[in-house]
A protein has these predicted regions:
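A structural signal for short loop-to-beta-strand junctions that line the ligand-binding cleft
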Residues: 88-89, 93-96, 124-160, 181-185, ...
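Mature extracytoplasmic/periplasmic domains
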Residues: 49, 271, 305-379
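Extracytoplasmic/periplasmic solute-binding protein
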Residues: 144-148, 154, 172-219, 260
């Protein structure tokens, strides 16, 4: 009797199993997906407005290369300079992949906004990019970003038919005044204003704790000699009739209006300036400036641009794939061809075309006077910008200069990131 009951139980179990198997083969699309159906993947990419058209072409190239998935990629304009301030407000709501300037790496890493790079992507970064750009993407021995340019600096553009003395700031202003043209300098932009402070010998230094948080910040921008020299030079520039405070839009407007004499900018403007000026197009290192009978060479920032991958992305592997593609050799070549953006990829940088590029040659010449844009105090940007704004507004004078410099330097020294 006991054996018969066991047999009946086994029979019932077998019938139930067969029923389940048959149900599984019923052809229900929800339970039996087509193995050939591609996964739909939506990604958001942030980058600067100047590169939007080019970036959209790159996106199409990415989709054409990777046909194993259906990619939908949206490009939103967020400049490299604004990336950290934007994404750290809510990392989970940020882009899957975003471009940023390398000085923001520590802030982004500490905020949990950067996924670490590993595997073949890491090997490719280290093998094919300049040592300085790899260093800029690295914190505590780990790589957190994909380098895509190594030209984040500035130098002098000028019209040879209007400027005969590009070596000195006084000569440039005199030539521009004589030709009825303008010298364009973004004097209320801290990135450019650093040229005067670095040129005068001023500096800052940040030390960090092991977790990336700030330990100490030192800054001598209010030094009685160094700070005063920089401040006086900025005041003198602002008072020149040939000076025009302006950004990229101002450069374009002066080119269009025929009143462009010279400008301090970077490689992203090389195409429009060279095409407009034609045979009168020229570029060189930044000029010297003179204060109280002493001559100083203008300094600058030097850095690179990177792509970061958001670790909260719903499609993390695909985000890494996109960042690697956008920063690879082929796309760095396209950036150079389309916008003359200087590559971090060593093979592209070694090409004859890049070596012969006038703007990149000027940037290379300025490099000896440049300060690496790494470990910049978080308060530097707003503090120096505010000082520059007051110089432009002519509320900074030689009489209150020491006070204004101290206010600026105190804000820098109070930096928390």
């Amino acid at each position: 009797m006991k054996k018969r009951m066991i047999a009946l139980a086994l029979s019932a179990t077998m019938v139930l199993s067969v029923g389940v198997m048959l149900a599984g083969c019923s052809g229900d699309p929800d339970t039996n997906p087509d193995p050939n159906e591609k996964e739909n993947v939506s990604l958001v990419l942030w980058g600067p407005s100047q590169q939007q058209t080019m970036a959209e072409e790159m996106i199409e190239a990415f989709k054409a290369k990777y046909t194993d998935k259906n990619y939908s990629i949206t490009y939103n304009v967020v400049s490299e300079a604004d990336a950290a301030g934007t994404i750290t407000t809510d990392v989970s709501a940020g882009a899957d992949v975003y471009a940023f300037a390398n000085d923001q790496l520590l802030v982004l890493q500490r905020a949990g906004a950067l996924a670490q790079v590993g595997g073949s992507y890491l090997e490719d970064i280290r093998a094919n990019n300049s040592a300085s750009s790899v260093e800029a993407a690295t914190f505590d021995g780990r790589v957190y970003a994909y380098p895509y340019s190594d030209d984040n600096g500035y130098f002098l553009y000028y019209d040879k038919s209007k400027v005969d003395s590009p070596e000195t700031l006084a000569g440039i202003l005199e030539d521009c005044a004589a030709s009825g043209s303008k010298f364009i300098f973004d004097l209320d932009n801290s990135w450019y204003d650093a040229a005067f402070f670095f040129g005068a010998g001023a500096s800052y230094e940040v030390t960090y704790n092991s977790d990336g948080s700030v330990n100490t910040v030192a800054c001598d921008f209010d030094d009685a000699t160094k700070g005063t020299v920089a401040g006086k030079a900025m005041i003198e520039l602002a008072n020149s009739s040939a000076f025009l405070n302006g950004d990229d839009n101002s450069i374009t407007a002066e080119l269009t209006g025929g009143t462009f004499g010279a400008a301090v900018s970077g490689t992203w403007n090389a195409k429009v300036i060279s095409e407009t000026l034609g045979e009168n197009y020229a570029a060189c290192k930044l000029p010297t400036f003179e204060v109280d009978g002493q001559t100083y060479q203008m300094g600058s920032f030097a850095g690179c641009k990177l792509y970061g991958v958001n670790p909260t992305s719903d499609h993390l592997a695909d985000a890494h794939r996109l960042a690697a593609f956008l920063s690879g050799e082929e796309m760095q070549q396209k950036r150079y061809d389309d916008m003359q953006i200087g590559p971090s990829n060593t093979k592209v940088a070694a090409s004859d075309a890049v070596k012969a590029n006038i703007a990149l040659a000027a940037l290379a010449d300025q490099a000896q006077y440049a300060t690496a844009q790494i470990a910049v105090p978080g308060g530097f940007w707003t503090a120096v910008e505010a000082f520059g704004q007051e110089v432009v507004a002519k509320t900074v004078t030689t009489e209150n200069l020491a006070e204004k410099l101290k206010t600026m330097a105190d804000l820098i020294r109070a930096s928390e990131n």
